Amino acid sequence: MARYFRRRKFCRFTAENVVEIDYKDIATLKNYITESGKIVPSRITGTRAKYQRQLARAIKRARYLALLPYTDNHQ
């Protein structure tokens, strides 16, 4: 019987001592949205609740300012 070892989830923002998540940092924000444009939940990414709220706020601001798309490319 094969045993599967899951990688331990950790909060990247806590590890890097991030104070505030910036909405202009598009490269970081893109890691936390799906291909369809949805925000990935913290139970998948391992992000702490404090940073998940900041992340959601930053993604929504970036979408509003057209830095990130609301949805994927419709084809």
From Swiss-Prot:
Superkingdom of this protein's organism: Bacteria
Gene Ontology terms: cellular component: cytosolic small ribosomal subunit
Gene Ontology BP annotations: translation
Signal peptide: none
Source organism of this protein record: Actinobacillus succinogenes (strain ATCC 55618 / DSM 22257 / CCUG 43843 / 130Z)
Assigned protein family: Belongs to the bacterial ribosomal protein bS18 family.
Coiled coil start-end: none
Protein name: Small ribosomal subunit protein bS18
GO molecular function: small ribosomal subunit rRNA binding; structural constituent of ribosome
Function of the molecule: Binds as a heterodimer with protein bS6 to the central domain of the 16S rRNA, where it helps stabilize the platform of the 30S subunit.
Keyword entries, A-Z: Ribonucleoprotein, Ribosomal protein, RNA-binding, rRNA-binding
InterPro entries to which the protein is assigned, alphabetical: Ribosomal_bS18, Ribosomal_bS18_CS, Ribosomal_bS18_sf
Oligomeric form and interacting partners: Part of the 30S ribosomal subunit. Forms a tight heterodimer with protein bS6.
Transmembrane segments: none
